[in-house]
């Protein structure tokens, strides 16, 4: 504790608060008090009227404070709302007024009992009959309109952001409601929520760079999961027919307004279904959740009007042809495709060695930014879809889709590959691609998954939906950091 107080010379405002704390203690008042019997939330008090003649016992943080002499006004706030309070010495009593009220600061947490009345400015107000100091604020809150404007500080000190900005609290309340609504939608349709490992012995389930950790006792490296896919499909092999896992994934990649290395996804699998069923399920989830949260499926995001129902469906090759004029339905060699890429200024990485890779680059570099209304883009090339089933009519492509809304991907799904020989061949191709320098390719064959497929995976549809991006969409948040309570930040200098 001595080290704590040694720093007060450099922080005079905090030192001043501690002097108040010493004075409070001299009056026998504990500055960091015990449990208070809060009987009602402020938001519920606001539903009542003065003529009901009710007495309320509540608690909250002081957000504004003004007064002198024998009368003080303040606003206190809790999670549910804010209300004005009126404190008069003659009504409260001299001891509580002099020893508590005069020692208050903005940011203090107080408990109080009082009755409602309407001020001459027609504001519903609590007339305080008794008061208790619950927690003395030591560090001053920022000024309401000039203080917490630096977004970096808002993200680093989310607790202050939540105190100062009720709209931020509302975003995270909505996030919880969105997740709850997704769970209910799936539960109501017979899906079982399950838990799968966060630490994986073999990398797999998605194309991404992993975080690596080490288990000392077993003396093995483990990967923080990039996706729960392979474990969930093993559960389908085991006899569960509808499962989902709503949890964290980790990808050791860049940080941006759309990417956080730790993020939340719901991943689900349904036996005796295919990617068409997943399209219907995906649209149903997003439309119903949007309706429940916002009261409509028509929303505005980033200045764009969006309708979250009746999603479009288009094959990747058809969209590329529409946007660029290049027709990848025609048979061509890798060299011919590479020449087309050069002509259209599409970059091709060194590890890419197939027409399928180039088709995907055409889409990502030329088409993604043009998709505004909700659109299922389907028919991804086999080379970039190692876990998806080949299309029966054209085995160069898969029964896979990604959902794009306003230039961003929100979901990824496919008819699951259940042929163990084909799956092993795809894994082998991934290993070769990793050796050519693709850090996102799977560098090792998951033999346990191939073995699981040998027991028999029924025809299955699977899908993953990014929760953070969906929350951004449904709350209008411009950055993923606005919907993650404690986002990853760069170290301070």
Curated annotation (Swiss-Prot):
Note on cofactor: Binds 3 Mg(2+) ions per subunit.
Major subcellular location class: cytoplasm
Cofactor: Mg(2+)
Protein known as: Lysine--tRNA ligase
A Gene Ontology molecular function term of the record: magnesium ion binding
Originating species: Fusobacterium nucleatum subsp. nucleatum (strain ATCC 25586 / DSM 15643 / BCRC 10681 / CIP 101130 / JCM 8532 / KCTC 2640 / LMG 13131 / VPI 4355)
UniProt keyword annotation of Cytoplasm present: yes
Gene name in the database record: lysS
Localization terms from the record: Cytoplasm
Any single Gene Ontology cellular-component annotation: cytoplasm
């Amino acid at each position: 504790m001595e080290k704590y107080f040694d720093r007060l010379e450099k922080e005079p405002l905090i030192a001043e608060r501690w002097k108040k704390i010493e004075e409070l203690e001299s009056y026998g008042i504990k500055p960091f008090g015990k449990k208070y019997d809060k009987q009602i939330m402020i938001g519920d008090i606001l539903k009542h009227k003065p003529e009901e003649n009710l007495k309320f016992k509540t608690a909250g943080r002081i957000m504004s404070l003004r007064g002198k002499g024998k009368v003080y006004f303040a606003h206190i706030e809790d999670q549910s709302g804010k209300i004005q309070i009126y404190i008069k010495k003659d009504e409260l009593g001299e001891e509580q007024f002099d020893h508590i009220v005069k020692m208050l600061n903005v940011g203090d947490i107080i408990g109080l009992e009082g009755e409602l009345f309407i001020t001459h400015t027609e504001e519903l107000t609590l007339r305080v009959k008794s008061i208790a100091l619950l927690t003395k604020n030591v560090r001053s809150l920022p000024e309401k309109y000039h203080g917490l404007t630096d977004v970096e500080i808002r993200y680093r000190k989310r607790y202050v952001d939540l105190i100062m900005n009720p709209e931020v609290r509302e975003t995270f309340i909505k996030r919880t409601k969105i997740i709850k609504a997704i769970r209910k939608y799936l539960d109501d349709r017979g899906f079982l929520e399950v838990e799968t490992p966060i630490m994986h012995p073999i990398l797999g389930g998605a194309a991404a760079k992993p975080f690596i950790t080490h288990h000392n006792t077993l003396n093995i490296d483990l990967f923080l999961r990039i996706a729960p896919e392979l474990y969930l499909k093993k559960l389908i092999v085991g006899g569960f027919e509808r499962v989902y896992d709503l949890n964290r994934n980790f990808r050791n990649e860049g940080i941006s307004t759309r990417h956080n290395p730790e993020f939340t996804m719901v991943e689900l699998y349904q036996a005796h279904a295919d990617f068409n069923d997943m399209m219907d399920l995906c649209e149903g989830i997003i439309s119903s959740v949007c309706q429940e949260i916002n009261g409509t499926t028509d929303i505005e995001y980033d200045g764009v009007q969006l309708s979250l129902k009746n999603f479009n469906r288009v094959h990747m090759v058809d969209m590329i042809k529409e946007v660029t004029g290049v027709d990848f339905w025609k048979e061509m060699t890798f060299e011919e495709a590479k020449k087309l890429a050069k002509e259209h200024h599409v970059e091709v990485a060194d590890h890419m060695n197939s027409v399928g890779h180039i088709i995907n680059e055409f889409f990502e570099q030329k088409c993604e930014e043009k998709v505004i209304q909700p659109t299922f883009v389907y028919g991804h090339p086999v080379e970039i879809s190692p876990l998806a089933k080949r299309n029966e009519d054209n085995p160069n492509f898969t029964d896979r889709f990604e959902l794009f809304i306003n230039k961003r991907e929100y979901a990824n799904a496919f008819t699951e590959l259940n042929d163990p020989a084909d799956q092993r061949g795809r894994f082998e191709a991934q290993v070769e691609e990793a050796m050519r320098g693709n850090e996102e390719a799977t560098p090792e064959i998951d033999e346990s998954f191939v073995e699981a497929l040998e027991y028999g995976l029924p025809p299955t549809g699977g899908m993953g939906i990014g929760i953070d991006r969906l929350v951004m969409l449904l709350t209008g948040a411009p950055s993923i950091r606005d919907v993650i309570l404690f986002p990853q930040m760069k170290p301070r200098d």
